[in-house]
């Protein structure tokens, strides 16, 4: 059901309504633009790109929009790094090289924090959550639960 709502898999029957609008056949990008966020169960398969930096993973859902991209489609790496640094501090993400740390080099708990920070920062209308605190320490679990709720 989670993959159907987020658009990762097509639904087999029925409809998915968001604020009365049928989103069943919409692309993942369109669902994101309508305000659907998704904290995935498998962070390494669907949640982030291990070869990308923290900054790139934070911007991945909106890389084509300002401030991450100009109207001509040129990426603004400074804006990406700035937002990532802000979220690294806010969510206590342990990233050795700050926003330029490769996501795959971080612990599973810190990878999870990157995903959670990205999704919460987007202020989604609907946040679909599967095991959001998996791999996190007790202090981080409490902080994340407060931010989600």
Q: Can you describe what each PLM-predicted range is?
A:
Residues 1-149:
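Glycine-rich phosphate-binding loops of nucleotide-dependent enzymes
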């Amino acid at each position: 059901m989670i993959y159907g709502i987020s658009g990762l898999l097509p639904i087999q029957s029925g409809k998915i309504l968001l604020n009365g609008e049928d989103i069943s056949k919409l692309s993942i990008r369109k669902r994101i633009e309508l305000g659907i966020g998704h904290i995935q169960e498998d962070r390494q398969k669907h949640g982030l790109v291990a070869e990308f930096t923290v900054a790139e993973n934070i911007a991945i859902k909106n890389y084509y929009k300002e401030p991450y991209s100009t109207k001509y489609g040129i990426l603004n790496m400074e804006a990406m790094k700035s937002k990532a640094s802000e979220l690294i501090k806010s969510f206590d993400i342990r990233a050795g090289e700050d926003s330029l740390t490769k996501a795959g080099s971080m612990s599973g708990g810190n990878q999870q924090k990157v995903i959670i920070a990205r999704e919460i920062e987007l202020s989604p209308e609907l946040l679909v959550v599967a095991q959001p605190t998996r791999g996190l320490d007790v202090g981080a679990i409490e902080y994340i639960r407060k931010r989600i709720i």
